[in-house]
Amino acid sequence: MSEPLKPRIDFDGPLQAEKIPPLKGARAFDTLEADNFAPARLVTGEEEEGAAEAVVESVLRPKRSLWRRMVSAGLAIFGVSVVAQGVQWTANAWQTQDWIALGGCVAGALIVGAGVGSLATEWRRLWRLRQRAHERDEARDMLHSHAVGKAKAFCEKLAQQAGLDQSHPALQRWYAAIHETQSDREVVSLYAQLVQPVLDAQARREISRSAAESTLMIAVSPLALVDMAFIAWRNLRLINRIATLYGIELGYYSRLRLFRLVLLNIAFAGASELVREVGMDWMSQDLAARLSARAAQGIGAGLLTARLGIKAMELCRPLPWIADDKPRLGDFRRELIGQLKETLQKSKTRPEK
């Protein structure tokens, strides 16, 4: 059976010829240009965030000006003068047998000694926090090194700082997996796979618990002032526990420095991740229409607490993130939403009973 003939199609105008794009002329490289040629390097999002964070840190870091040096020198001279005057008063009180003045000099010396000891302790703790950043840079260099012999002692020092005993199962597995012929990169990678996840899991549990408490507190409490005080207290406590977990003892100034670094990182480097992780998921699931305003505020506060905990982990952790071991905000988000839904369902079923 033959198919029917199709009707003829008439075009209004003539067919246009296909346009051939003009070709660029060939470029010949000489020997010098060919040797120095390098492809353009692609800049990733993490590198852009790191560059922006470095710029902000350099802007906020106080510069050592001449006036600051003059003030420091004046304070040093004043301190030496006070000590010299105290020694002279003590000698005069001893010679004249003025026991009341001598007792005052001894009490002042004890107070000054306690203050100097406190400042020395704070400086040591602040130095320990800065040293952790150097250890992280050293570990990053070892992860790209093929040398042999330095990584084992370095990892043993990290385990000792974290309070892990030599008989710990994770350390025993690490000792069984390494041998003398392995490079520093392989030894540090094994430590990051076998030992470091033990501490990271504990830090994750601390972050999950603090984020859940912040979420439920905001969702239930009707007082905004109480909410703010509770969240601030829980966030400071979370930073302290994470720092202690990774073997860092925080003092007053070191705690302020760590809190400043965490907030700086969240404000300038974490905005894009927060929008990407939270905004798209909320738009897709339409949670704003399902939950009340207080519940939505609770989830937001819990996510900010989780974000703060993740950045505290990153600053206190002795090793850089490798592959996909960095905790994601989406994991904590799903936990918070599930816990909040369970709490709301329980609160609705109680009046019915």
From Swiss-Prot:
Annotated InterPro entries: DUF697, UPF0283
Similarity comment: Belongs to the UPF0283 family.
Subcellular location: Cell inner membrane
Main subcellular location: membrane
Record membrane topology: Multi-pass membrane protein
UniProt superkingdom: Bacteria
A cellular component term, taken from the record's GO annotations: plasma membrane
Keyword tRNA processing listed: no
HAMAP family, A to Z: UPF0283
Keywords noted in UniProt: Cell inner membrane, Cell membrane, Membrane, Transmembrane, Transmembrane helix
Name the record gives this protein: UPF0283 membrane protein KPN78578_12740
Residue spans crossing the bilayer: 70-90, 99-119, 213-233
